[in-house]
Each structure stands twice: as C-alpha cells, then as structure tokens.
Regions:
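N-terminal cap/lid segment of alpha/beta-hydrolase-fold proteins
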Residues: 1-17
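The alpha/beta-hydrolase serine catalytic core
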Residues: 4, 109-193, 197-204, 208-231
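Active-site glycine-rich loops that stabilize anionic/oxyanionic intermediates
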Residues: 20, 28-31, 181
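The serine-hydrolase catalytic nucleophile loop
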Residues: 29-41, 189
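Conserved alpha/beta-hydrolase
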Residues: 40-62
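Catalytic nucleophile-loop/oxyanion-hole region of alpha/beta-hydrolase
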Residues: 58-84
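Short beta-strand immediately N-terminal to the catalytic nucleophile in serine-hydrolase-like folds
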Residues: 92-94, 117
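Gly/Ala-rich beta-loop-alpha elbow adjacent to hydrolase catalytic centers
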Residues: 94-102
C-alpha cells in the first residue's frame, strides 16, 4: 500500500517495500504525485522504492508555496536531503517542467539513474520564444516585471533571469531521455544538444507529442523505463 507523508510542506507518497534504493518522481505541469504509481509498478519489482512529491499549486495544494523555481527548487532540495538520509542509492524520474526543477535541485549531486521524459531543458530559450510570439521585448519585460500573455500564462522578468542564471547540467552518468517526435514544447535541437553535451541516451517515440497519456504511450514509457534499468 502506498504511504502518504509530508516532507516539510510538500505532500508525498511512497511506493514499494523497504529497499536500499529509491527514485524521486517529479511530475510535470498539471500532473500529480499519483502518476508515479505506473512507474512504481515497473521499478518496485526491480528493488526500487518510489517517492513522489506534489509540486506547489497542484492537486489542490494550497499552502502558500508557489510554482516558481526560487520556491520549488529549495523544496525539492529538502526532499533530496530527506532521501539521502534514508536510502543508499538514489535515482531521479522526472517529467517536463519537473525535469527542469529536479535537475536544478540535484545540481552538484550524482544519482545512479536519471530518467527524463519530455524534459524542459532550456527555459530561457522557451521564455524568449514566448516573448517573441507575443511581441514583447526584454526591455519591456524588465520594466514591467510581469506581463500576461494569451493562453493564461504570465511572463516574468525574475523568472527569465533565474532561467538564465540556472542552466541545467547532468546529474548522472546514466541519464536517459524519452522524447516524442511531435513534442510541441521542446525543439529536437535542444534535446540533441543536451544529449551530445552530457552523453545521454535518447529514445524518440514516433507519433508522440509532449504529453504521454494515451494507453499505448504509457505502455511505451513503461517499456523504456524497464529497458534503461536493465542496461
């Protein structure tokens, strides 16, 4: 049975029987910690527990912590420290925005495995692209601080500065990426550049977009996860 706990203010759920190894699962935007149940079904039989945390402002979480990196990353660092005290071996399994946040939270650390699906890897580039589409200059954003744009999002000068100052790197020699060929969020060139720089394994899923959610896509994801751990 999953065990529901809190780590600081972060709600979390732990899957699997006691073990010496554990993955941290970090969901993406509009996701939730219970998404880790599918991943746990893959790795629990292989001797890994899975600890999944709820990102701020998700799944009814209303505790004052905001989904901005200067609040979410320190929270994940607290979770990281919690895990280091309890497990000998750690892995990271993260999705989309969760991947960007997790890579920052584990910067300077080394984990046994790092499995990233549809990862956001260059937030500065993504924000600048959104600014260009909305016709907003860096100078205007700097002066105004925050500017709402179509689609319900808000561009933030502080967020842009953070992204510029906190580029992500590798946290494991065993880093594997799963990328949908129709991903509308992250250009293939960004994925390829990261994989070349850090010698990562890349699996490209034909027909898939950024969000892997169809049954056949989830089956493909589970297969990919199992393959990485069996290498």
């Amino acid at each position: 049975m999953p065990e529901y706990i809190k780590i600081g203010r972060a709600p979390a759920v732990l899957y699997g029987e006691p073990a010496e190894r554990a993955f941290l699962f970090v969901h993406g935007l509009c996701g939730n910690k219970e998404e880790a149940q599918r991943f746990a079904a893959v790795v629990n039989p292989l001797g890994w527990q899975v600890l999944a945390v709820e990102l701020p402002e998700h799944n009814g979480r209303q505790d004052g912590v905001r989904l901005v990196p200067w609040e979410a990353v320190p929270e994940l660092q607290n979770v990281r420290n919690y895990m280091k005290e309890r497990w000998q071996t750690l892995g990271v399994r993260a999705v989309s925005l969760g991947a960007w946040l997790a890579l920052q939270a584990f910067a300077g650390e080394s984990v046994d495995y790092c499995l990233l699906s549809s990862p956001l890897l260059d937030m500065e580039k993504m924000i600048c692209s959104m600014m260009a589409q909305a016709g907003i200059s860096k100078e205007r954003l700097r002066v105004e601080g925050e500017i709402p744009v179509p689609g319900g999002q808000t561009l933030s000068w502080r967020y842009l500065c953070w992204a510029r100052e906190h580029s992500v790197s590798s946290i494991s020699p065993k880093t594997s990426l799963l990328y949908g060929v129709k991903d509308e969020m992250t250009p293939r060139s960004t994925i390829d550049a990261y994989c070349r720089k850090f010698a990562c394994s890349l699996t490209v899923a034909e027909g898939a977009a950024h969000w892997f959610h169809m049954p056949e896509e989830e089956t493909r994801m589970s297969q990919w996860e199992r393959e990485q751990l069996e290498k």
